[in-house]
Amino acid sequence: MMSKNKIFIFANMLIFSIFIMSCSSQEYTTAKLAIQQSDFSKASEWLPKAMEVEPDNPEIPMVMAIEIHAQNEDWNEMIALFDRAMRINSEKVVEIRGAFISVKEAVSNYVEFYWAKEFNEGVAQFKKM
């Protein structure tokens, strides 16, 4: 017979597992796992599917913008996805790369970051002339 401590631990793990599974769709969970494994091809396949299943989740277009399009320097698509996330809910707090931040603040931070990165690369190229 199981001890009370083991039953308590098992019950907590079961509740935690149910909570985690109810938070995200299977598609989004698959995409996040692919990102964690640096399988960006698989992530780019699953993130659009996740957006179809969870059209009201601004975190998904944010993640796709940052992890797929920004990495590929596809700035137009990155901005389009940022705009989509802002239209869904600019005030919602989402998890981006382990940080919890509002969509509006994340968009501002990442646009500024990538703009500065491109600007600095341009300056470096200019100095080589």
PLM features: what roles do these ranges have?
Residues 42, 76-77, 121:
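Alpha-helical positions within canonical tetratricopeptide repeat
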Residues 38, 72-73, 129:
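Residue-level detector of the short coil/turn that links helix A to helix B
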Residues 19-22:
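C-terminal motif of bacterial Sec signal peptides marking the signal peptidase cleavage site
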Residues 69-94:
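TPR/TPR-like (Sel1-like) alpha-helical repeat modules
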Residues 55-56, 90:
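Short coil turns that delineate tetratricopeptide repeat
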Residues 34, 46, 77, 81-84, ...:
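Alpha-helical solenoid repeat scaffolds, predominantly canonical TPR units
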